[in-house]
Amino acid sequence: MKPILFSFFGVKILSYTVFSFLAIIASIFYIIKNLQKQKIKIDYFDYLFWTILFGALGSKIIYIVLYPNQFDFSIFYSGGAVSWGGIFFGCIAAILYLKKHHLPISKILDISIFGLFIGIAIGRIGSFLNGDGYGKITDLWIGVKIPKVDLSPRYPAEIFESMALIILLITLYLIKKKQKLQTPGLISLIIFSFYFMIRFINDFFKDNFHRYCGLTFNQIFCLFGIGVIIIFIIWRKHGFWSESRFFKSTKRKIRKKFEKT
């Protein structure tokens, strides 16, 4: 573990902060580059600002709600975040922004979510170095010691997740290069589907004492997420949901408001 990466003129530079910064930069770079490649006209920085802001706040808010006894203002810069909160609030902010500006939601979300999970893969390394999300005690050679917990070798659960995400993203990238997965929204569904499975399995390796019916909050959320994806696929297959209908409903509501005034 290395929560303090290095010191610069007496200032301690935290691993979590450095890798969070690298994660954000990598995500932004990928998203902007691919939006430009697709020639999508959008205010990149305005879109990313609101998405990242709500994502960051969401991850902290959910952490405070789930672990109120561990609240400390230091969580806003040194760890203490629930990724689901960030993903959920960030996606909601992105969808609302794209809907407001009448931009192709599925197409842009495919790029944004791919970029987001590049960031998560990098961010997990920072969490590992900070000693967060530590695994159960193990006798295997892969065990690592977490000094702030104890000196028993434990599963490097955060590294497991990071490696699984890297493999998933590289695989999808190679498939995309062959001009496959062209259906808007398909990449997002694949990433979320696999990520739910990765998190569900990985949590069995984590030493998480907050369990409900034998499952962690993350695992319960994963099951819920998989259910939502299945329902969404069924809706889309039977034509109950489409972006054009989504935008038409918005225009109709706006028109009604103007008619009332």
Where on the chain are the PLM-derived regions?
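Hydrophobic, membrane-interfacing alpha helices
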Residues: 1-261
